[in-house]
Amino acid sequence: MSRIAVVTSHPLFASSGGHLVIANALVTALQEFGHEATVVLTPQNRFGRQGAAYLSTWLMDLGQAYDGRPVDQVISFRYPSYAIQHDSHVCWINHRMREYYDQWPRFSRSLSWRARTKERVRRALIHAADRYLLEDCVTQVYAQSHTIQARLARWGRLSAEVLHPPPPPRPYRCDRYGEYVLVASRLTPLKRIHLVLEALRLPPAQMVRCVIVGDGESRDWLIGLTKEYGLENRVTFAGQVSETELLEHLANCRAVCFPTTEEDYGLVTVEAFASRKAVITCTDSGGPTELVCNEKNGLVIEPTAKSLAIALARISEDSALAESFGVAGLRQVTAMTWQRAVDRLLLV
């Protein structure tokens, strides 16, 4: 039996993100396969103090536990958790600090010249630190998607094998193909939930109902759009829900819509498949497009309101189509096992 520390950063008072769900799922899998495992959370400081978060993580001692026994291996996730020092260190990365990588143009656009200059310096330092840590201080790097793998290669010329996370070990089920499409996501601009609302107001999708699960900075704006578009009778904002409530929605929705842009992975995709539900996503959605095969287990459409409206209408009007896609998705995700993931991640 090995003793494994699963390490990830997490913002203070933030609700559980996908990285934390995957970390906890990995711990559960490790324990089921006879190992001793725990999640270790490292700081993720606000802008201007990222260096301190990297340093404090670098100085954290994970060499041995309270009882004097050694920690045999570390498996880290997102920045700056991979700054942990350990002789047996695998990084299963879901992302670096995206504001300094693929999201730099969007992030820096609104900054003053003075702030942009300061952030350029920080960006260069973070790039250098990330490359050193992932190239020289980690035994093995796995990317959670081909999208992440491509970013590592583009910014830093870092190589990584791809290992998609399986669905978390939850009691998924399919009760029916109900009368609404489910959106389960943080409500932030990159998730592009407004595209769903814009699609629902178009003629093809004017009979489609939608339940939106999740919370975030865009919530008030999205609620305002819903009222502006006259969609109050067809769109329900369920807010942050428990795991039980999420599984209930997955079991009873017609399909899952995830129109995100440049997503790292998109855990809801495999959770939908595990619930025998189709997924609608967009051609530029990143991670989900690696799993959703157009016209086989879901629909991959252009990121326009018109295309999404047509896709929503097709799924909503044809329960047999939704079911056939869902069955194909379940078949695909069944092959993604935690046994395989653990076998690849373990060095000891």
Regions found by a protein language model. Name each.
Residues 173-202, 211:
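Conserved donor-binding/catalytic core segment of Leloir-type glycosyltransferases
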Residues 283, 293-306, 314-319:
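Conserved acidic donor-binding segment of nucleotide-sugar-dependent glycosyltransferases
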